[in-house]
């Protein structure tokens, strides 16, 4: 039996980098058009009013305003933006 392992065998180095997923701007916080609200895999949250969805299911603001989370039918979670003009009045 060899007392040392052969050169080149490595058990480490397979850990993938974290993808920094999750909510970036929370309910009640102000945001600007284009701000990323949520990064996600699949539609854990669905786009509501004034929210766009990227091809990787990222939700982003289409207008300036305040973020609002709500639960719809069958526990489907939605994110919406209440426009800044509506919140000022």
UniProtKB/Swiss-Prot annotation:
Molecular-function annotations in GO: structural constituent of ribosome
Biological processes, Gene Ontology terms: translation
Keywords: Ribonucleoprotein, Ribosomal protein
UniProt key word Manganese: no
GO cellular component: cytosolic large ribosomal subunit
Keyword hit for Ribosomal protein: yes
InterPro entries: Ribosomal_bL27, Ribosomal_bL27_CS
Pfam family, one: Ribosomal_L27
PANTHER family the UniProt entry points to: LARGE RIBOSOMAL SUBUNIT PROTEIN BL27M, RIBOSOMAL PROTEIN L27
Family (UniProt): Belongs to the bacterial ribosomal protein bL27 family.
Protein name, per record: Large ribosomal subunit protein bL27
Organism, scientific name: Bacteroides thetaiotaomicron (strain ATCC 29148 / DSM 2079 / JCM 5827 / CCUG 10774 / NCTC 10582 / VPI-5482 / E50)
Lineage: Bacteria, Pseudomonadati, Bacteroidota, Bacteroidia, Bacteroidales
